Design a protein with these regions (language model features):
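Perimembrane loop-to-helix junctions flanking transmembrane segments
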Residues: 38-63
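Alpha-helical transmembrane segments of multipass membrane proteins
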Residues: 25-28, 32, 77, 81, ...
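Loop-to-transmembrane helix junctions at the membrane interface
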Residues: 69, 74-114
């Protein structure tokens, strides 16, 4: 027999972890975006100092309209995941049905970031690091999704 209290605690822990990691990711992306924009402004002014050509190209490619759109989309998805996970924490506390949406969004952004990494990253080591980080996120979302599914199935059985 499954201990639903353990499932509930496990889901709560996973959801809190998702909130923390997505919040950190959000802050990191915002600071990175600001830094890259400031670097681009300096490059456009001609203040390249002794930066290698590869670094200048990396800054310029990170500030294309497409990459700015992708960054904004990722920030919005991170915000949505955090908001829905906070709502799920309330649902867990009140023994209500848990929403799968933050976990679906997490899966989608994980797959999207792996694909984006292959399309935009030239260094094999950077691609490998991206895959490892996204695999960790993917496993966390999958774990939380499974626990949410177990709790929701139990809640459906109880109400029927």
């Amino acid at each position: 027999m499954v201990s639903y209290e353990k499932v509930r605690r496990s889901l709560r822990t996973a959801t809190i972890t998702i909130i923390v990691l997505n919040s950190l990711s959000l802050v990191f992306r915002l600071f990175t975006g600001i830094s890259v924009q400031l670097a681009k402004t300096e490059i456009n002014k001609g203040n390249t100092g002794n930066l290698p050509k590869e670094h200048i190209e990396a800054v310029l490619s990170a500030t294309t309209p497409f990459m700015l759109f992708v960054t904004a989309l990722i920030v919005l998805v991170n915000i949505a995941i955090v908001i829905f996970c906070i709502k799920n924490l309330r649902a867990i506390k009140r023994n209500q049905m848990v929403n799968y949406l933050p976990y679906y969004l997490g899966f989608a952004i994980t797959v999207g970031l792996v694909i984006l990494g292959f399309l935009t990253t030239k260094a094999p080591w950077a691609i490998a690091i991206n895959i490892v980080f996204q695999a960790i996120f993917g496993l966390l979302y999958f774990h939380a999704y499974q626990k949410a599914q177990k709790l929701n199935e139990r809640d459906l059985e109880v109400t029927n």
